[in-house]
C-alpha cells in the first residue's frame, strides 16, 4: 500500500538514514518483482522520490508468479543453488533485480540498471555459490 510505504520511508528518513528504498510490487510481493511493476519510495540525499519500476525496462522478462514459486524447502534450495550458479531464468532475473537494487541503494553503483548488470555478471561468475559454500563450511566448524 502506497500510504504504508510512504510512512515507512518517512520513518527511515527521520531516523537519519541517508539512503533507502521501500518497494511493493503491484502483485503484492514486498520486493521488486519481475511479475509486475513496482511502486518505489526512495530516500536519497535527504529527499524522498516516488516512482515505478517496470522490469521490462531493464531487459528482464516478465513472468507469472507461478514461474518463480516453489512448493517445498528442497525445491527452494535447489532453485536457489541453480540461480547462484548462474542458471538463467525467471529466478535469476528476480535475484538480479533485487541484488541490483541493493547495490544501487548501498552506493555501490550509480543506477539500478548498472546494479542489475553487475548482479548478473556476479551470478554468471559462480562466485555467489562459492561464497555460500565457504559460509556453510565455516558455520559447520563453529
Predicted feature descriptions by range:
Residues 1-142:
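Glycine-rich anion-binding loops and their surrounding alpha/beta cores
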Amino acid at each position: 500500500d502506497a500510504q504504508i510505504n510512504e510512512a515507512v520511508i518517512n520513518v527511515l528518513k527521520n531516523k537519519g538514514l541517508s539512503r533507502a528504498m521501500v518497494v511493493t510490487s503491484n502483485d503484492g510481493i514486498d520486493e521488486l518483482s519481475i511479475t509486475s511493476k513496482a511502486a518505489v519510495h526512495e530516500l536519497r540525499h535527504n529527499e524522498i522520490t516516488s516512482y515505478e519500476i517496470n522490469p521490462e525496462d531493464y531487459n528482464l522478462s516478465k513472468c507469472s508468479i507461478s514461474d518463480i514459486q516453489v512448493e517445498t524447502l528442497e525445491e527452494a534450495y535447489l532453485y536457489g543453488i541453480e540461480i547462484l550458479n548462474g542458471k538463467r531464468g525467471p529466478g535469476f532475473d528476480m535475484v538480479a533485480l533485487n541484488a541490483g537494487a541493493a547495490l544501487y541503494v548501498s552506493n555501490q553503483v550509480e543506477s539500478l540498471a548498472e546494479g542489475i548488470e553487475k548482479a548478473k555478471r556476479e551470478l554468471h561468475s559462480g562466485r555467489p555459490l562459492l561464497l555460500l559454500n565457504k559460509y556453510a563450511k565455516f558455520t559447520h566448524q563453529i
